[in-house]
């Protein structure tokens, strides 16, 4: 039962795209990925960053939100790195297609297999910025993850919006310290 988590990559104080560059570098850290990298924007941090910045410049959309970072996580022992790669590759192809520059990687450095996706905030086909609306996770994003997981014989997420058992980010972070 993979779960998809979402976050945006904003512009740092003073402008620029340092957060985007740092996020790309983090997800492509070779100490974590074992070379399990894919996407349509390149395979090195420099190449991916340049492709995304070129798209922003082409459409004159260099300000504001720079990109998005999704994480798809599997419980320990549920998915192999090859299955995780296939799930995340298919998720990206279905959800992002060729509309957005993206890169993804599988991190194998934890007990649980998980993949990171970073995609550009600017649609490379029409120049519009990606918009996440309240409810998109439940209506579109997690159902794609579930459908792709089932395609590979992995269970879907059992989600009850009235019985939230997860921890808030603050609670999770406090436990780590």
Regions found by a protein language model. Give the residues of each.
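N-terminal nicking endonuclease/strand-transfer module with a His-rich metal-binding environment
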Residues: 1-177
């Amino acid at each position: 039962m993979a779960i998809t988590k979402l976050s945006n990559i904003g512009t740092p104080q003073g402008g620029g795209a340092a957060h985007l560059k740092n996020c790309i570098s983090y997800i492509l850290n070779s100490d974590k990925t074992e070379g399990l990298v894919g996407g349509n924007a390149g395979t090195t941090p420099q190449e991916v960053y340049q492709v995304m910045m070129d798209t922003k410049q082409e459409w004159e959309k260099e300000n504001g939100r720079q990109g998005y970072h999704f994480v798809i996580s599997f419980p320990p022992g549920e998915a192999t790195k090859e299955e995780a790669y296939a799930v995340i590759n298919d998720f990206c192809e279905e959800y992002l297609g060729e509309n957005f520059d993206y890169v993804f990687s599988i991190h194998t450095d934890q007990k649980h297999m998980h993949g990171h996706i970073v995609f550009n905030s600017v649609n490379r086909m029409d120049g519009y910025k990606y918009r996440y609306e309240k409810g998109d996770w439940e209506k579109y994003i997690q159902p794609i993850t579930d459908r792709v997981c089932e395609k590979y014989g992995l269970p879907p997420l059992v989600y009850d919006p009235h019985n939230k058992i997860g921890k808030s980010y603050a609670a999770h972070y406090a436990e780590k310290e």
